[in-house]
């Protein structure tokens, strides 16, 4: 199963879409065969499968770009494609942080509505966690306190090891420092929204 072409391509796009180097693979494509010179009038095109080099990863993560170079539509499209929520988020918190304990980039979203299962026992909070552009955890719960469990987004740090386990993450000093920093950023943004954007803050209050 894991050696199937589209399975391999899917794994690359999920876990290594944002590493800095191109990942290429021979991918099958349907191509029309040349029409014979003596083809009859009712000739129907024939197709064959050919294999061509295709770059599977996009290489340039949106969160690595400067905020001033990213449009609101790009932020919203990324949110829709990553988190399958087609309502425009109320807020985007995009920041680059340098610290003695850990340096990281984060891109967080305050949704306009609660996830459909938010109030059920099956809901799993957490942010996507990347190490140098490689996804190492899809939902890292340790990055968010329970009361900010509705926040969606990701964190990327070059200070984390690619082969770190879930058990090691729970005791990782760098991850704890990142979590504390994120909590402060979210609180600050919500207070700012309460003061400067009352309409959206009231939408947030009703949703959560």
Model regions and ranges:
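Long, intrinsically disordered, charge-dense linkers/tails
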Residues: 1-208
């Amino acid at each position: 199963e894991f050696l199937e072409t589209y399975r391999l391509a899917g794994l690359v796009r999920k876990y290594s879409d944002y590493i800095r180097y191109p990942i290429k693979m021979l991918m099958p494509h349907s191509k029309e065969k040349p029409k014979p010179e003596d083809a009859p009038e009712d000739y129907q095109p024939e197709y064959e499968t050919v294999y061509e080099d295709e770059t599977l990863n996009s290489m340039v993560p949106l969160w690595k770009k400067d905020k001033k170079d990213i449009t609101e539509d790009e932020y919203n499209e990324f949110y829709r494609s990553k988190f399958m929520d087609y309502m425009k988020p109320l807020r985007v918190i995009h920041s680059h942080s340098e610290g003695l304990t850990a340096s990281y980039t984060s891109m967080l979203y305050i949704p306009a509505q609660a996830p459909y299962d938010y109030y059920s026992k099956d809901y799993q909070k957490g942010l996507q966690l990347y190490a140098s552009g490689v996804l190492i955890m899809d939902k890292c719960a340790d990055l968010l306190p329970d009361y900010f469990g509705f926040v969606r987004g990701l964190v990327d740090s070059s200070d984390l090891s690619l082969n770190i386990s879930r058990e090691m993450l729970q005791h990782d000093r760098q991850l704890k420092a990142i979590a504390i920093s994120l909590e402060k950023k979210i609180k600050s943004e919500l207070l700012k929204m309460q003061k400067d954007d009352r309409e959206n803050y009231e939408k947030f209050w009703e949703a959560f």
